[in-house]
Amino acid sequence: MSLRLPALFLAAAFTATALADEASVRRGVEARFDGIKVDSVTKTSYADLYEIVVGETLFYTDEKVNFVFKGDIIDARSQKNLTEERQQKLSAIKFEDLPLDLAIKQVRGNGKRAVAIFSDPFCPYCKSLDRALLRQDDITIYTFLYPILRAESPDKARTIWCAPDRAKAYYDFMLNGREPAAGPSCNAPVDKWLALGKKIGVRATPTSFTTNGERILGARPEELVKLIGEAQK
């Protein structure tokens, strides 16, 4: 026991010091930038920098808050973008918390892989992503209509949602430009779509989420397919 006490003491002392340093940096940032509210401070493992998160913004500073750096930090040895990796983790969600009953569901093959995509009916990049994903089998795609691009986007989203076959209406319109067949009027959950997107920070379309909660911005099908596969492992 006597041999373990010093190690435990040192670990506790190190943790306390780290927490004290992070608290000091937090106070320093908030003092330097009057009115700013820091969400988190984390000591990084590189260059004695501290990671600062304010809302959706991530930047770095030194212990004394004399310098601030906003941009990407690249590990020259591995060529990894450390900032991008960290932002991916910070922007992750719990996939199981998504209200999938508000999404258009399409199952291909056994549907064992899954992805959720926020899409505007008039988004050209959404159409490009939808077309690229046609080549994927054994996948379930949950499409949340997110009508934010045009004034007519909400009406088009309503028409698609109220169609007799939502998935067919959506893909016919996105891939072939076919107008959705007129269906009976229904209460399309436009307000719920918009509230959901705002809640999880969806700012543009397409925005996709894998089952492990990772967020992918834009039409990047190759990267998305890779991440979808990794999420299922």
What kind of feature is each model-predicted range?
Residues T17-R158, D172-L175, E179-T205, P221-K233:
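Extracytoplasmic thiol/disulfide redox context detector
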Residues M1-L5:
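Positively charged n-region of N-terminal signal peptides that target proteins for export
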Residues A167-Y171:
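Conserved, helical-rich catalytic subdomain that frames metal- and/or nucleotide-binding sites
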Residues I160-A163:
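Mechanochemical coupling/switch segment within NTP-driven translocation systems
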Residues P6-T15:
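Bacterial N-terminal signal peptides
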Residues G55, T211-N212:
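Short strand-coil-strand connectors
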